[in-house]
Amino acid sequence: VKNQYSKIIKIGLYIFITLAILVLVTFIWFKPIRVIFAHHLSLLHCDGQVCVDDPKTQPLAKTLYNQALKETQNKVGAFHQQPTMVFCSTPQCANTFGMEKAAAKAVGNLGLLVAPRGWKDFYITHELIHHRQAEEWGNIAMLTKPKWLVEGMAYSLSDDPRPTLSVPFQQWRAQFKLWHQQNPDSNIWHATEKVK
């Protein structure tokens, strides 16, 4: 009996160590996941769900967050819970979160990141739409739904002011607009359930 418990404890310990290593590796190599720990990172100053690397930028970040949140909710419904958003005003902060060339990035429904060039309402609304998509469809479905639906919806409903987007985003925005006109359901999430 003692030997049996010893084996169970060893297996449990191996599983725990494996999971701990997996979490550590994910945290190191997939930098955007760090948004989960935004409130605990010393380089950030958080007020509610808005985190900034420079405290002087907090008022502007809060204004952008609140405006984009309201606009997004008007277009795609209320959030299940208000997302955490990290606003980086320096390239160093953006690099900490693995932003690379992105202006902003939604990390599923875990949080959002905004790089220095992304401090514009349409970028933030675009990423909040992705956050809502992840809330409604799930994080895995964000990878399996058609790109024209995922990206087209975000570009179209965020009122991105650029008349022409790069390939393939321009086509995806146009395809979504056409689909949306043909499927005028007041509950956009109900309408998108049918799209595979």
Summary of predicted features, one role per range:
Residues 2-39, 169-196:
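Pan-zinc metallopeptidase signature
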Residues 135, 139, 166-167:
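Catalytic toxin/effector domains delivered as secreted proteins or via bacterial secretion systems
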Residues 122-135, 154-155:
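Active-site recognition of the HExxH zinc-binding catalytic motif
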Residues 38-60:
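Short extracytoplasmic/periplasmic juxtamembrane "stem" segments immediately C-terminal to an N-terminal membrane anchor
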Residues 143-179:
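Post-HExxH zinc-binding segment in Zn-dependent metallohydrolases
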Residues 61-68, 120, 124, 149-153, ...:
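Stable alpha-helical elements in mature extracytoplasmic
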Residues 108-125, 139-146:
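Short pre-active-site segment immediately N-terminal to the catalytic Zn-binding motif
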Residues 52-108, 117:
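Auxiliary, metal-adjacent structural segments of Zn-dependent hydrolase domains
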